[in-house]
């Protein structure tokens, strides 16, 4: 589990990234600018813990709507995806909404892009292009980076499922209160304009959309 940590050579790059206008898909029970405090997530880089052992709330976002949708609505799409089904009713049951973030200034994010990983002796296929079996190792890496880089406000990488989009995971305790807001109230991912993007992704993936 610690092999990724042991492989790190030198300090990671801290990228200055403006996330103003970025997108997140999240359960409707959370506000658009709320950090997720759940200890039950089973994601590549979360949950993480603070020094006192409590769960660190985090926020995921992407710079493209397609990236945000692929990492949520399509997260369980099989590979190969051609011929698979996506049920509209299943999306509706999850009560997912889309929010657009507003943030006034750049954030300092640990660069886990291909170049950022290469800088420290890691590769994309060790950290990003991995399945859930490897999540304990990638979470341990994220925990290590969070603890060793107190100036970092989150992580930055290229989406595994939509590699034209950048993704971030932000640390709640390093973002000033009310520093991040939303441009408008959240809207359902089944609102016509957003659902059109879902159907376009379905077409790209060769899937069938069952309404």
Predicted regions located by residue number:
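Active-site and NAD+-binding cores of ADP-ribose-processing enzymes
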Residues: 1-47, 78-211
């Amino acid at each position: 589990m610690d092999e990724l940590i042991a492989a790190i050579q030198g300090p990671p790059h801290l990228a200055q990234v403006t996330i103003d206008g970025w997108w997140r898909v999240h359960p409707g029970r959370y506000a658009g600018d709320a950090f997720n405090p759940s200890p039950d997530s089973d994601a590549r880089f979360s949950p993480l813990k603070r020094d006192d052992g409590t769960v660190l709330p985090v926020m995921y976002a992407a710079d493209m709507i397609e990236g945000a949708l692929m990492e949520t609505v399509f997260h369980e799409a099989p590979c190969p995806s051609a011929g698979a089904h996506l049920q509209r009713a299943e999306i509706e049951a999850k009560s997912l909404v889309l929010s657009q973030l507003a943030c006034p200034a750049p954030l300092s994010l640990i660069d886990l892009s291909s170049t950022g990983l290469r800088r420290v002796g890691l590769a994309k296929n060790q950290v990003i292009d991995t399945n859930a079996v490897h999540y304990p190792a990638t979470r341990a890496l994220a925990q290590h980076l969070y603890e060793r880089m107190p100036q970092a406000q989150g992580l930055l990488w290229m989406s595994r499922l939509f590699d034209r989009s950048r993704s971030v995971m932000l640390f709640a305790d390093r973002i000033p209160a009310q520093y991040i807001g939303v441009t408008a109230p959240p809207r359902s991912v089944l609102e016509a304009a957003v659902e059109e993007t879902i159907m376009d992704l379905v077409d790209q993936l060769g899937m069938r959309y069952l309404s």
